[in-house]
UniProtKB/Swiss-Prot annotation:
Its EC number is 2.3.1.35, 2.3.1.1. Keywords: Acyltransferase, Amino-acid biosynthesis, Arginine biosynthesis, Autocatalytic cleavage, Mitochondrion, Multifunctional enzyme, Transferase. Heterodimer of an alpha and a beta chain. This is Arginine biosynthesis bifunctional protein ArgJ, mitochondrial. It is found in: Mitochondrion matrix. PANTHER family: ARGININE BIOSYNTHESIS BIFUNCTIONAL PROTEIN ARGJ (PTHR23100), ARGININE BIOSYNTHESIS BIFUNCTIONAL PROTEIN ARGJ, MITOCHONDRIAL (PTHR23100:SF0). GO terms for molecular function: glutamate N-acetyltransferase activity; L-glutamate N-acetyltransferase activity.
Amino acid sequence: MASKSTSTAVWGQLRHLAQQQTRCYSATADSIPASKKKYVPTKGVYPKGFRVSGTIVGVKPGNTTKPDLAFVTSDTPCAAAAVFTKNRFQAAPVTFSRDLLKKKGNSGVNGVIINSGCANAVTGKGGLEDAESMAREADRCLGGDGTIVMSTGVIGQRLPIKRILDNVPAAHSRLGSSHDHWLSCATAICTTDTFPKLMSRSFTLPSSPSVEYRIAGMTKGAGMIHPNMATLLGVIATDAPIAPAVLPSLLKNAVDRSFNSITIDGDTSTNDTVALLANGAAGGKEIASESSPDFAAFRDVLNVFSEDLAKLIVRDGEGATKFVTIRVVESDSEETAKKVASTIARSPLVKTALYGKDANWGRILCATGYALISEPGSAAVAEVSDKIVPEKTNVSFVPTDGTAELKLLVDGEPEQVDEVRAAEILKAEDLEILVRLGTGKAEGTYWTCDFSHEYVTINGDYRT
Protein backbone atom coordinates (compact mmCIF):
# COMPACT_ATOMS: atom_id res chain seq x y z
CA MET A 1 0.00 0.00 0.00
CA ALA A 2 1.37 3.45 -0.94
CA SER A 3 2.41 5.75 1.88
CA LYS A 4 0.63 9.01 2.54
CA SER A 5 3.63 11.01 1.31
CA THR A 6 3.79 8.98 -1.90
CA SER A 7 0.06 9.48 -2.55
CA THR A 8 0.44 13.22 -1.95
CA ALA A 9 3.34 13.39 -4.40
CA VAL A 10 1.39 11.51 -7.07
CA TRP A 11 -1.62 13.77 -6.62
CA GLY A 12 0.64 16.80 -6.88
CA GLN A 13 1.99 15.51 -10.19
CA LEU A 14 -1.53 14.98 -11.51
CA ARG A 15 -2.51 18.50 -10.48
CA HIS A 16 0.55 19.86 -12.30
CA LEU A 17 -0.32 17.91 -15.45
CA ALA A 18 -3.89 19.20 -15.34
CA GLN A 19 -2.70 22.78 -15.00
CA GLN A 20 -0.47 22.26 -18.04
CA GLN A 21 -3.60 21.53 -20.07
CA THR A 22 -4.55 25.22 -19.61
CA ARG A 23 -8.07 24.59 -18.39
CA CYS A 24 -8.55 28.28 -17.73
CA TYR A 25 -11.33 30.62 -18.75
CA SER A 26 -11.36 31.43 -22.46
CA ALA A 27 -8.30 29.73 -23.90
CA THR A 28 -6.22 31.98 -26.13
CA ALA A 29 -4.69 30.74 -29.36
CA ASP A 30 -1.22 30.41 -27.87
CA SER A 31 -2.52 28.27 -24.99
CA ILE A 32 -4.41 25.68 -27.06
CA PRO A 33 -2.94 22.18 -26.56
CA ALA A 34 -1.12 20.92 -29.65
CA SER A 35 -3.49 17.95 -29.95
CA LYS A 36 -6.52 20.28 -30.16
CA LYS A 37 -5.24 22.86 -32.64
CA LYS A 38 -6.45 20.73 -35.55
CA TYR A 39 -10.03 21.47 -34.47
CA VAL A 40 -9.60 25.26 -34.66
CA PRO A 41 -10.28 26.66 -38.16
CA THR A 42 -7.80 29.03 -39.79
CA LYS A 43 -10.39 30.45 -42.19
CA GLY A 44 -14.12 30.31 -42.79
CA VAL A 45 -17.11 31.27 -44.93
CA TYR A 46 -19.40 33.46 -42.85
CA PRO A 47 -23.02 34.48 -43.46
CA LYS A 48 -23.74 37.88 -44.97
CA GLY A 49 -25.09 40.63 -42.76
CA PHE A 50 -23.69 39.33 -39.47
CA ARG A 51 -20.97 41.09 -37.47
CA VAL A 52 -19.39 39.77 -34.29
CA SER A 53 -16.77 40.63 -31.67
CA GLY A 54 -14.98 39.37 -28.57
CA THR A 55 -13.96 41.85 -25.86
CA ILE A 56 -11.89 41.62 -22.67
CA VAL A 57 -14.03 42.75 -19.72
CA GLY A 58 -12.65 40.86 -16.73
CA VAL A 59 -15.89 39.18 -15.67
CA LYS A 60 -13.87 36.56 -13.83
CA PRO A 61 -11.63 38.27 -11.27
CA GLY A 62 -8.05 38.49 -12.44
CA ASN A 63 -8.81 38.03 -16.14
CA THR A 64 -7.04 40.78 -18.06
CA THR A 65 -5.94 38.90 -21.17
CA LYS A 66 -8.81 36.79 -22.49
CA PRO A 67 -12.00 37.98 -24.21
CA ASP A 68 -15.06 37.21 -22.10
CA LEU A 69 -17.83 39.30 -23.69
CA ALA A 70 -19.15 38.06 -27.05
CA PHE A 71 -21.43 40.07 -29.31
CA VAL A 72 -23.23 38.57 -32.33
CA THR A 73 -25.30 41.03 -34.37
CA SER A 74 -27.23 41.22 -37.61
CA ASP A 75 -27.41 44.31 -39.79
CA THR A 76 -31.13 43.64 -40.22
CA PRO A 77 -33.59 42.13 -37.71
CA CYS A 78 -33.55 38.32 -37.72
CA ALA A 79 -35.92 35.47 -37.35
CA ALA A 80 -34.70 33.66 -34.24
CA ALA A 81 -35.38 30.54 -32.21
CA ALA A 82 -33.74 29.03 -29.15
CA VAL A 83 -33.86 25.93 -27.01
CA PHE A 84 -33.13 26.16 -23.31
CA THR A 85 -32.10 24.04 -20.33
CA LYS A 86 -34.71 21.92 -18.58
CA ASN A 87 -32.99 22.34 -15.22
CA ARG A 88 -35.55 23.69 -12.72
CA PHE A 89 -33.06 26.29 -11.46
CA GLN A 90 -32.97 28.27 -14.68
CA ALA A 91 -30.53 31.14 -14.90
CA ALA A 92 -31.68 34.74 -15.29
CA PRO A 93 -30.56 35.04 -18.95
CA VAL A 94 -32.53 31.89 -19.79
CA THR A 95 -35.70 33.37 -18.29
CA PHE A 96 -35.13 36.71 -20.00
CA SER A 97 -34.34 35.28 -23.43
CA ARG A 98 -37.23 32.82 -23.42
CA ASP A 99 -39.65 35.63 -22.56
CA LEU A 100 -38.13 37.88 -25.23
CA LEU A 101 -38.58 35.35 -28.03
CA LYS A 102 -42.15 34.63 -26.93
CA LYS A 103 -42.98 38.35 -26.84
CA LYS A 104 -41.46 39.01 -30.26
CA GLY A 105 -42.86 35.89 -31.92
CA ASN A 106 -39.41 34.66 -32.94
CA SER A 107 -38.82 37.72 -35.13
CA GLY A 108 -37.19 41.14 -34.89
CA VAL A 109 -34.08 39.94 -33.06
CA ASN A 110 -30.96 42.08 -33.43
CA GLY A 111 -28.38 39.73 -31.96
CA VAL A 112 -26.97 37.93 -28.95
CA ILE A 113 -24.75 39.20 -26.13
CA ILE A 114 -22.87 36.63 -24.06
CA ASN A 115 -20.58 36.81 -21.05
CA SER A 116 -18.37 34.03 -19.72
CA GLY A 117 -16.94 33.77 -16.21
CA CYS A 118 -20.22 34.17 -14.30
CA ALA A 119 -23.43 32.22 -14.91
CA ASN A 120 -25.83 34.78 -13.39
CA ALA A 121 -27.74 31.75 -12.09
CA VAL A 122 -29.56 31.46 -8.75
CA THR A 123 -29.14 35.22 -8.34
CA GLY A 124 -32.76 36.21 -7.69
CA LYS A 125 -34.50 39.35 -8.87
CA GLY A 126 -31.21 41.24 -9.07
CA GLY A 127 -29.81 38.70 -11.51
CA LEU A 128 -32.82 39.09 -13.80
CA GLU A 129 -32.38 42.86 -13.69
CA ASP A 130 -28.73 42.39 -14.68
CA ALA A 131 -29.72 40.28 -17.70
CA GLU A 132 -32.29 42.90 -18.70
CA SER A 133 -29.73 45.69 -18.39
CA MET A 134 -27.27 43.80 -20.64
CA ALA A 135 -29.98 43.53 -23.29
CA ARG A 136 -30.95 47.20 -22.94
CA GLU A 137 -27.38 48.40 -23.40
CA ALA A 138 -26.90 46.13 -26.41
CA ASP A 139 -30.20 47.38 -27.86
CA ARG A 140 -29.10 50.98 -27.33
CA CYS A 141 -25.91 50.36 -29.28
CA LEU A 142 -27.73 48.52 -32.06
CA GLY A 143 -30.75 50.81 -32.25
CA GLY A 144 -33.28 48.02 -31.74
CA ASP A 145 -35.10 46.16 -29.01
CA GLY A 146 -34.36 42.47 -29.46
CA THR A 147 -31.11 41.14 -28.00
CA ILE A 148 -30.86 37.61 -26.60
CA VAL A 149 -28.70 37.26 -23.47
CA MET A 150 -26.54 34.29 -22.46
CA SER A 151 -24.16 33.76 -19.54
CA THR A 152 -21.87 30.93 -18.44
CA GLY A 153 -19.52 30.38 -15.53
CA VAL A 154 -19.80 30.02 -11.77
CA ILE A 155 -23.32 29.63 -10.33
CA GLY A 156 -24.61 31.71 -7.42
CA GLN A 157 -22.61 34.88 -7.98
CA ARG A 158 -23.83 38.24 -9.26
CA LEU A 159 -22.38 39.65 -12.45
CA PRO A 160 -19.94 42.57 -12.26
CA ILE A 161 -22.69 44.35 -14.17
CA LYS A 162 -21.20 47.85 -14.24
CA ARG A 163 -18.00 46.50 -15.77
CA ILE A 164 -19.99 44.63 -18.40
CA LEU A 165 -22.25 47.56 -19.27
CA ASP A 166 -19.29 49.92 -19.52
CA ASN A 167 -17.74 47.59 -22.11
CA VAL A 168 -20.77 46.92 -24.32
CA PRO A 169 -20.05 50.05 -26.42
CA ALA A 170 -16.48 48.82 -26.88
CA ALA A 171 -17.79 45.42 -27.97
CA HIS A 172 -20.07 47.21 -30.44
CA SER A 173 -17.19 49.28 -31.84
CA ARG A 174 -15.16 46.12 -32.44
CA LEU A 175 -17.81 44.38 -34.54
CA GLY A 176 -16.63 42.88 -37.80
CA SER A 177 -17.19 39.99 -40.20
CA SER A 178 -13.69 38.59 -40.72
CA HIS A 179 -12.51 35.17 -39.61
CA ASP A 180 -10.53 36.78 -36.79
CA HIS A 181 -13.68 38.51 -35.53
CA TRP A 182 -15.58 35.22 -35.47
CA LEU A 183 -12.72 33.39 -33.77
CA SER A 184 -12.42 36.08 -31.10
CA CYS A 185 -16.16 35.90 -30.50
CA ALA A 186 -16.05 32.11 -30.18
CA THR A 187 -13.15 32.42 -27.74
CA ALA A 188 -15.07 34.89 -25.58
CA ILE A 189 -17.77 32.37 -24.67
CA CYS A 190 -15.31 29.73 -23.43
CA THR A 191 -14.89 28.77 -19.76
CA THR A 192 -12.84 25.63 -19.08
CA ASP A 193 -12.69 24.88 -22.80
CA THR A 194 -9.16 24.38 -24.13
CA PHE A 195 -10.05 25.60 -27.62
CA PRO A 196 -12.72 27.79 -29.25
CA LYS A 197 -15.38 25.83 -31.11
CA LEU A 198 -16.20 27.52 -34.41
CA MET A 199 -17.47 26.15 -37.71
CA SER A 200 -18.78 27.53 -40.99
CA ARG A 201 -19.80 26.18 -44.36
CA SER A 202 -21.75 27.04 -47.50
CA PHE A 203 -24.74 25.28 -49.06
CA THR A 204 -27.43 25.66 -51.72
CA LEU A 205 -31.19 25.22 -51.70
CA PRO A 206 -33.37 23.58 -54.40
CA SER A 207 -35.31 26.76 -55.24
CA SER A 208 -32.15 28.87 -55.70
CA PRO A 209 -29.35 26.56 -56.89
CA SER A 210 -27.19 29.49 -58.03
CA VAL A 211 -27.27 31.24 -54.64
CA GLU A 212 -24.55 30.40 -52.13
CA TYR A 213 -25.94 30.39 -48.61
CA ARG A 214 -23.75 30.27 -45.55
CA ILE A 215 -24.05 29.03 -42.00
CA ALA A 216 -21.70 29.63 -39.07
CA GLY A 217 -21.83 28.48 -35.49
CA MET A 218 -19.94 28.69 -32.24
CA THR A 219 -20.44 26.72 -29.08
CA LYS A 220 -18.81 26.18 -25.72
CA GLY A 221 -18.80 23.42 -23.19
CA ALA A 222 -16.31 21.11 -21.55
CA GLY A 223 -18.02 19.95 -18.37
CA MET A 224 -21.53 19.67 -16.93
CA ILE A 225 -22.69 18.46 -20.35
CA HIS A 226 -25.74 16.23 -20.41
CA PRO A 227 -29.18 16.76 -21.97
CA ASN A 228 -31.28 18.58 -21.86
CA MET A 229 -28.83 20.31 -22.57
CA ALA A 230 -25.99 21.28 -20.18
CA THR A 231 -23.42 24.04 -19.57
CA LEU A 232 -23.51 24.49 -23.24
CA LEU A 233 -24.02 27.69 -25.14
CA GLY A 234 -24.39 27.84 -28.88
CA VAL A 235 -25.16 30.43 -31.53
CA ILE A 236 -25.84 29.42 -35.12
CA ALA A 237 -26.33 32.08 -37.79
CA THR A 238 -27.37 31.77 -41.42
CA ASP A 239 -28.09 34.22 -44.23
CA ALA A 240 -30.79 31.94 -45.65
CA PRO A 241 -34.33 33.42 -45.62
CA ILE A 242 -36.36 31.41 -43.09
CA ALA A 243 -39.77 32.38 -41.71
CA PRO A 244 -40.05 32.76 -37.91
CA ALA A 245 -42.89 30.22 -37.84
CA VAL A 246 -40.75 27.30 -39.02
CA LEU A 247 -37.46 28.17 -37.33
CA PRO A 248 -38.26 26.58 -33.91
CA SER A 249 -39.05 23.16 -35.38
CA LEU A 250 -35.84 23.22 -37.43
CA LEU A 251 -33.76 23.99 -34.35
CA LYS A 252 -35.50 21.49 -32.07
CA ASN A 253 -35.05 18.71 -34.62
CA ALA A 254 -31.35 19.54 -34.96
CA VAL A 255 -30.70 19.85 -31.22
CA ASP A 256 -32.38 16.52 -30.45
CA ARG A 257 -29.94 14.83 -32.84
CA SER A 258 -26.85 16.70 -31.71
CA PHE A 259 -26.54 18.73 -28.52
CA ASN A 260 -29.07 16.48 -26.79
CA SER A 261 -27.07 13.41 -27.80
CA ILE A 262 -23.81 14.21 -26.01
CA THR A 263 -22.65 13.78 -22.43
CA ILE A 264 -19.43 14.52 -20.57
CA ASP A 265 -20.30 13.92 -16.93
CA GLY A 266 -24.09 13.47 -16.69
CA ASP A 267 -24.71 16.88 -15.08
CA THR A 268 -27.31 19.26 -16.53
CA SER A 269 -26.64 22.98 -16.17
CA THR A 270 -28.79 25.98 -15.28
CA ASN A 271 -27.76 28.04 -18.29
CA ASP A 272 -27.61 26.06 -21.50
CA THR A 273 -29.02 27.77 -24.56
CA VAL A 274 -28.67 27.23 -28.29
CA ALA A 275 -29.98 29.97 -30.57
CA LEU A 276 -30.52 29.97 -34.33
CA LEU A 277 -30.60 33.29 -36.21
CA ALA A 278 -31.64 33.74 -39.86
CA ASN A 279 -31.47 37.17 -41.52
CA GLY A 280 -32.13 36.30 -45.18
CA ALA A 281 -29.28 38.53 -46.36
CA ALA A 282 -28.30 36.14 -49.17
CA GLY A 283 -31.71 36.54 -50.80
CA GLY A 284 -33.84 33.91 -52.51
CA LYS A 285 -37.22 32.43 -51.72
CA GLU A 286 -38.22 32.40 -48.06
CA ILE A 287 -38.56 28.99 -46.41
CA ALA A 288 -42.07 29.30 -45.00
CA SER A 289 -43.53 25.79 -45.19
CA GLU A 290 -42.38 22.59 -43.53
CA SER A 291 -43.51 20.68 -46.63
CA SER A 292 -41.24 22.58 -49.02
CA PRO A 293 -38.10 21.02 -50.57
CA ASP A 294 -36.08 23.98 -49.24
CA PHE A 295 -37.21 23.22 -45.69
CA ALA A 296 -36.07 19.60 -46.00
CA ALA A 297 -32.76 20.64 -47.55
CA PHE A 298 -31.98 23.21 -44.86
CA ARG A 299 -33.08 20.78 -42.14
CA ASP A 300 -30.49 18.28 -43.38
CA VAL A 301 -27.78 20.97 -43.52
CA LEU A 302 -28.61 22.15 -40.00
CA ASN A 303 -28.73 18.61 -38.59
CA VAL A 304 -25.27 17.70 -39.86
CA PHE A 305 -23.84 21.11 -38.92
CA SER A 306 -25.22 20.88 -35.37
CA GLU A 307 -23.94 17.33 -34.96
CA ASP A 308 -20.45 18.38 -35.99
CA LEU A 309 -20.54 21.33 -33.56
CA ALA A 310 -21.73 19.10 -30.73
CA LYS A 311 -18.92 16.61 -31.36
CA LEU A 312 -16.37 19.39 -30.80
CA ILE A 313 -17.71 19.76 -27.26
CA VAL A 314 -17.13 16.07 -26.54
CA ARG A 315 -13.63 16.29 -27.98
CA ASP A 316 -12.91 19.00 -25.42
CA GLY A 317 -14.51 17.24 -22.45
CA GLU A 318 -12.78 18.06 -19.17
CA GLY A 319 -9.94 15.60 -18.75
CA ALA A 320 -10.98 13.65 -21.85
CA THR A 321 -8.48 11.55 -23.79
CA LYS A 322 -10.99 9.71 -26.00
CA PHE A 323 -13.94 10.51 -28.26
CA VAL A 324 -16.43 7.64 -27.95
CA THR A 325 -19.45 6.91 -30.12
CA ILE A 326 -22.11 4.76 -28.44
CA ARG A 327 -24.34 3.22 -31.11
CA VAL A 328 -27.33 1.08 -30.19
CA VAL A 329 -29.03 -0.73 -33.09
CA GLU A 330 -31.70 -3.38 -33.68
CA SER A 331 -33.88 -1.82 -30.99
CA ASP A 332 -37.66 -1.95 -30.67
CA SER A 333 -37.80 1.87 -30.80
CA GLU A 334 -35.59 4.94 -31.16
CA GLU A 335 -36.56 5.89 -27.60
CA THR A 336 -35.19 2.61 -26.21
CA ALA A 337 -32.03 2.88 -28.28
CA LYS A 338 -31.34 6.46 -27.16
CA LYS A 339 -31.99 5.58 -23.52
CA VAL A 340 -29.58 2.65 -23.61
CA ALA A 341 -26.93 4.69 -25.44
CA SER A 342 -27.34 7.56 -22.97
CA THR A 343 -27.00 5.27 -19.96
CA ILE A 344 -23.81 3.67 -21.28
CA ALA A 345 -22.42 7.07 -22.22
CA ARG A 346 -22.77 8.54 -18.74
CA SER A 347 -21.69 5.47 -16.73
CA PRO A 348 -18.62 6.40 -14.64
CA LEU A 349 -17.52 2.75 -14.62
CA VAL A 350 -17.62 2.54 -18.41
CA LYS A 351 -15.86 5.88 -18.79
CA THR A 352 -13.06 5.05 -16.34
CA ALA A 353 -12.53 1.65 -17.98
CA LEU A 354 -12.12 3.40 -21.33
CA TYR A 355 -9.55 5.75 -19.84
CA GLY A 356 -7.68 2.76 -18.41
CA LYS A 357 -7.85 0.98 -21.80
CA ASP A 358 -9.65 -1.88 -20.07
CA ALA A 359 -11.90 -4.03 -22.30
CA ASN A 360 -14.38 -4.47 -19.46
CA TRP A 361 -17.50 -5.18 -21.48
CA GLY A 362 -19.31 -6.28 -18.32
CA ARG A 363 -19.71 -2.61 -17.39
CA ILE A 364 -21.27 -1.88 -20.78
CA LEU A 365 -23.65 -4.80 -20.33
CA CYS A 366 -24.51 -3.70 -16.80
CA ALA A 367 -25.44 -0.19 -17.98
CA THR A 368 -27.51 -1.68 -20.80
CA GLY A 369 -29.39 -3.87 -18.35
CA TYR A 370 -30.54 -1.09 -16.02
CA ALA A 371 -31.05 1.60 -18.66
CA LEU A 372 -34.84 1.30 -18.80
CA ILE A 373 -35.52 0.61 -15.13
CA SER A 374 -36.77 3.77 -13.44
CA GLU A 375 -37.37 2.14 -10.06
CA PRO A 376 -36.50 -1.16 -8.35
CA GLY A 377 -38.91 -4.07 -8.28
CA SER A 378 -40.02 -7.05 -10.33
CA ALA A 379 -42.81 -5.07 -12.02
CA ALA A 380 -40.29 -2.59 -13.44
CA VAL A 381 -38.12 -5.42 -14.75
CA ALA A 382 -41.09 -7.18 -16.33
CA GLU A 383 -42.12 -3.95 -18.04
CA VAL A 384 -38.89 -3.83 -20.06
CA SER A 385 -38.34 -7.57 -20.52
CA ASP A 386 -39.29 -7.47 -24.21
CA LYS A 387 -37.16 -4.40 -24.92
CA ILE A 388 -33.84 -5.74 -23.62
CA VAL A 389 -33.46 -9.51 -23.98
CA PRO A 390 -30.13 -10.88 -22.67
CA GLU A 391 -30.15 -13.82 -25.10
CA LYS A 392 -30.41 -11.44 -28.08
CA THR A 393 -27.88 -8.83 -26.97
CA ASN A 394 -24.53 -8.33 -28.72
CA VAL A 395 -21.68 -5.98 -27.74
CA SER A 396 -18.65 -5.04 -29.85
CA PHE A 397 -15.80 -2.55 -30.05
CA VAL A 398 -15.59 -0.97 -33.50
CA PRO A 399 -12.22 0.54 -34.47
CA THR A 400 -12.13 3.70 -36.58
CA ASP A 401 -9.46 2.39 -38.95
CA GLY A 402 -11.98 0.41 -40.99
CA THR A 403 -10.98 -3.01 -39.68
CA ALA A 404 -13.53 -5.53 -38.43
CA GLU A 405 -15.36 -5.05 -35.15
CA LEU A 406 -14.12 -6.91 -32.09
CA LYS A 407 -17.01 -8.98 -30.77
CA LEU A 408 -17.23 -9.13 -26.97
CA LEU A 409 -20.70 -10.63 -26.46
CA VAL A 410 -22.73 -12.59 -29.02
CA ASP A 411 -26.38 -13.45 -28.32
CA GLY A 412 -25.77 -13.10 -24.60
CA GLU A 413 -22.71 -15.36 -24.62
CA PRO A 414 -19.18 -13.99 -23.95
CA GLU A 415 -16.58 -14.30 -26.69
CA GLN A 416 -12.95 -15.24 -26.15
CA VAL A 417 -11.60 -11.70 -26.39
CA ASP A 418 -8.31 -10.99 -28.13
CA GLU A 419 -6.87 -8.78 -25.39
CA VAL A 420 -4.00 -7.57 -27.57
CA ARG A 421 -6.38 -6.34 -30.28
CA ALA A 422 -8.70 -4.89 -27.65
CA ALA A 423 -5.81 -2.91 -26.19
CA GLU A 424 -4.89 -1.60 -29.65
CA ILE A 425 -8.46 -0.42 -30.26
CA LEU A 426 -8.67 1.23 -26.84
CA LYS A 427 -5.38 3.07 -27.38
CA ALA A 428 -6.94 5.08 -30.21
CA GLU A 429 -8.35 8.55 -29.63
CA ASP A 430 -11.62 7.59 -31.37
CA LEU A 431 -13.61 4.39 -30.95
CA GLU A 432 -17.15 3.08 -31.13
CA ILE A 433 -19.11 0.84 -28.77
CA LEU A 434 -21.77 -1.04 -30.72
CA VAL A 435 -24.72 -2.68 -28.96
CA ARG A 436 -27.19 -4.81 -30.91
CA LEU A 437 -30.39 -5.43 -28.95
CA GLY A 438 -31.91 -7.81 -31.50
CA THR A 439 -35.48 -6.69 -30.82
CA GLY A 440 -36.25 -4.45 -33.82
CA LYS A 441 -34.85 -2.09 -36.45
CA ALA A 442 -34.55 1.26 -34.64
CA GLU A 443 -31.28 2.79 -33.55
CA GLY A 444 -29.84 5.65 -31.51
CA THR A 445 -26.44 7.26 -31.04
CA TYR A 446 -24.69 9.17 -28.25
CA TRP A 447 -21.27 10.75 -28.13
CA THR A 448 -19.20 10.85 -24.97
CA CYS A 449 -15.64 10.76 -23.65
CA ASP A 450 -13.68 8.99 -20.94
CA PHE A 451 -13.05 10.05 -17.32
CA SER A 452 -9.46 10.77 -16.29
CA HIS A 453 -7.61 12.03 -13.21
CA GLU A 454 -7.62 15.48 -14.77
CA TYR A 455 -11.43 15.70 -14.61
CA VAL A 456 -11.29 15.54 -10.80
CA THR A 457 -8.50 18.11 -10.62
CA ILE A 458 -10.24 20.60 -12.91
CA ASN A 459 -13.55 20.46 -11.07
CA GLY A 460 -11.92 20.46 -7.65
CA ASP A 461 -10.25 23.78 -8.54
CA TYR A 462 -13.13 25.29 -10.57
CA ARG A 463 -13.79 28.35 -8.39
CA THR A 464 -10.16 29.06 -7.45
